[in-house]
């Protein structure tokens, strides 16, 4: 009895054909008719910095800390979303950063969908830097805040004079955004 010899090239081709033939019934099983899930609407895009007005209100003070609402109003002309903590730092009149940026406390993050004209807010806490020893803070008056909306790389400046530390201590904390 004489068996034909196959070259490695022919052997590989035959193996590929056999595998393909074996997979055809398996592929057919995967395409059995089944009800499809209803299509879900895509969520609105993230809010671009250029489409937001950033402003503050509701300042209240207790035991050495001032709390304010840091607000984000969507004026982009369409719905958009915010999720997470804004980036916040004190700035000089010339726009230079003063001291450390605001800390982000651990918190549950929620996606906030803003219709055009709607506002989301984040609570900003600023420590009265007068409570720190003079050498631990190097206090100056900030001209305002540089604010990066969550997940954005472009900032807005918010005029807001307040006492800031130029070195050392973290003196601000900002919560994640939530619906107003």
Where in this protein do the model-derived segments appear?
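Short, solvent-exposed loop/turn segments enriched in Ser/Thr/Gly
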Residues: 63-69, 139-142
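Short, hydrophobic/aromatic beta-strand segments
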Residues: 77-86
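Low-complexity, acidic Ser/Thr/Pro/Gly-rich terminal tails and inter-domain linkers that flank the onset
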Residues: 39-62
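Intrinsically disordered, low-complexity Pro/Gly/Ser/Thr-rich segments with frequent PxxP/GP/PP motifs
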Residues: 103-130
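Asparagine-centered strand-capping/turn motif at beta-strand->loop junctions
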Residues: 70-77
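C-terminal region of N-terminal signal peptides and the immediate post-cleavage residues
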Residues: 24-46
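Terminal connector regions
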Residues: 129-170
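N-terminal export and membrane-targeting signals
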Residues: 2-19
């Amino acid at each position: 009895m004489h068996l034909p010899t196959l070259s490695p090239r022919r052997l590989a081709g035959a193996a590929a054909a056999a595998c393909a033939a074996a997979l055809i019934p398996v592929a057919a099983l995967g395409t059995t008719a089944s009800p499809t899930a209803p299509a879900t609407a895509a969520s609105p895009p993230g809010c671009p910095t250029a489409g937001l007005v950033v402003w503050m209100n509701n300042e209240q003070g207790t035991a050495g800390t001032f709390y304010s609402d840091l607000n984000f109003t969507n004026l982009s002309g369409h719905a958009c979303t915010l999720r997470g903590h804004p980036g916040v730092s004190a700035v000089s009149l010339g726009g230079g950063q003063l001291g450390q940026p605001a800390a982000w406390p651990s918190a549950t993050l929620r996606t906030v969908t803003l219709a055009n004209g709607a506002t989301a807010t984040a609570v900003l806490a600023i420590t009265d830097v007068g409570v720190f020893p003079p050498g631990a803070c190097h206090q100056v008056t900030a001209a305002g805040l540089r604010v990066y909306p969550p997940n954005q790389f472009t900032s807005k400046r918010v005029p807001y004079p307040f006492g800031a530390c130029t070195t050392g201590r973290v003196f601000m904390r900002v919560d994640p955004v939530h619906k107003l």
